């Protein structure tokens, strides 16, 4: 029986771990990030992969930093035939990459060589891509640069957001690995070198990328809002406070005013001027110091004094 060490952290990875267990693979250990404080009360919370591993009765290793750690030596001592990673969150050191006889395999949420890096789903939606997918690949020292074993594409629908695509790709990754792993174990799999001329990157989202620039047109802003939904969430500023925009659509109004200006107010939304005469219609918001609410709730309460001509920056 092929022995596996699985490495992953978020919800994306948990169905993949469950599949490996259901298929009867010998999972020597599950490696995941340490428990972290979550929410306003900062409650120490295990990552989803740890929760799944506990449910399945699998050994768990949680290194703060893998490179040079005791946990790394523990992993190496298990002598797995293959290491499988899926959104683990740390770069694997060379001594681990070289250890398994079948190599280290990664389940990556993009159609490589496009969108190497830690935020491929966010970036594909922000960029307005019509398609994304999952790549099963051999791992190399260079981030997401290893040879491609298999890929599976899905469309990005116009109303998709990062959370929805994240869930879709988790299932795609699970199924693609299930279909691909036997050929890897039997050493009959395909292996394609990535075309370096086609490489694009998707680094972790920065605070600046979260900020709405109202001079961009409404399509660009809509892609930004849905690419950052439900985390980390796009924001603007209003009345000297950060104002989160959880959901918005392309507005119907046209304008010739300064971008960021409120140009229309309806019962369940309001429209803000964007670039090139377009508008963004805000439906789900969070004013500074308040909870998330619908635009209708905002306009009845905190935002009841919002007027046409008010300025978001």
From Swiss-Prot:
Q: Please provide the record's keywords in A-Z order.
A: Protein biosynthesis, Transferase
**What is the name of this protein?**
Methionyl-tRNA formyltransferase
Q: Which GO terms describe its cellular component?
A: cytosol
- Tell me what gene encodes this: fmt
Q: Which organism is it from?
A: Lysinibacillus sphaericus (strain C3-41)
Does this entry carry the keyword Transferase?
yes
Matching entries from PANTHER family are given as: METHIONYL-TRNA FORMYLTRANSFERASE, METHIONYL-TRNA FORMYLTRANSFERASE, MITOCHONDRIAL
Q: What is the lineage of its organism?
A: Bacteria, Bacillati, Bacillota, Bacilli, Bacillales
Identify its protein family. Belongs to the Fmt family.
Q: Which HAMAP family match?
A: Formyl_trans (MF_00182)
The record's PROSITE patterns line, in alphabetical order, gives: GART
Q: Name one Pfam family in it.
A: Formyl_trans_C
Return the SUPFAM superfamilies for the record. Answer: FMT C-terminal domain-like, Formyltransferase
Question: What reactions does this protein catalyze?
Answer: L-methionyl-tRNA(fMet) + (6R)-10-formyltetrahydrofolate = N-formyl-L-methionyl-tRNA(fMet) + (6S)-5,6,7,8-tetrahydrofolate + H(+)
Show the GO MF annotations. Answer: methionyl-tRNA formyltransferase activity
According to its UniProt record, the EC number is 2.1.2.9
Entries under CDD domains matching the protein: FMT_core_Met-tRNA-FMT_N, Met_tRNA_FMT_C
- Protein residues bound to (6S)-5,6,7,8-tetrahydrofolate: 110-113
Q: What does this protein do?
A: Attaches a formyl group to the free amino group of methionyl-tRNA(fMet). The formyl group appears to play a dual role in the initiator identity of N-formylmethionyl-tRNA by promoting its recognition by IF2 and preventing the misappropriation of this tRNA by the elongation apparatus.
EC category name = transferase
């Amino acid at each position: 029986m092929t022995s596996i060490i699985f490495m992953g952290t978020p919800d994306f990875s948990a169905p993949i771990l469950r599949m490996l267990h259901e298929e009867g693979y010998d999972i020597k250990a599950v490696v995941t990030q340490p428990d972290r404080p979550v929410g306003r009360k900062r409650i120490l919370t295990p990552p989803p992969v740890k929760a799944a591993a506990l449910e399945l009765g699998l050994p768990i290793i949680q290194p703060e930093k893998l490179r040079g750690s005791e946990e790394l030596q523990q992993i190496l001592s298990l002598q797995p035939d293959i290491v499988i990673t899926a959104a683990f969150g740390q770069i694997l050191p060379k001594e681990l990459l070289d250890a398994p006889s079948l190599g280290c395999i990664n389940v990556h949420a993009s159609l490589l060589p496009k969108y190497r890096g830690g935020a491929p789903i966010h970036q594909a939606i922000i960029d307005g891509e019509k398609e994304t997918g999952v790549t099963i690949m051999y791992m190399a020292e260079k981030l997401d640069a290893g040879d491609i074993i298999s890929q599976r594409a899905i469309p990005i629908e116009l109303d998709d957001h990062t959370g929805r695509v994240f869930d879709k790709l988790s299932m795609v990754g699970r199924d693609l690995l299930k279909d691909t792993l036997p050929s890897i174990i039997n050493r009959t799999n395909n292996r394609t070198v990535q075309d370096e001329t086609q490489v694009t990157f998707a680094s972790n989202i920065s605070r600046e990328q979260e900020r709405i620039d109202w001079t961009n047109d409404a399509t660009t802003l809509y892609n930004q809002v849905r690419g950052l939904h439900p985390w980390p969430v796009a924001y603007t500023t209003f009345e000297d406070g950060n104002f989160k925009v959880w959901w918005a659509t392309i507005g119907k109004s046209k304008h010739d005013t300064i971008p960021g200006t409120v140009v229309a107010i309806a019962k369940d939304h309001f429209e803000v001027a964007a670039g090139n005469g377009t508008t963004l219609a805000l439906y789900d918001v969070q004013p500074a110091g308040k909870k998330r609410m619908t635009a209708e709730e905002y306009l009845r309460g905190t935002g009841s004094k919002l007027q046409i001509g008010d300025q978001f920056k």
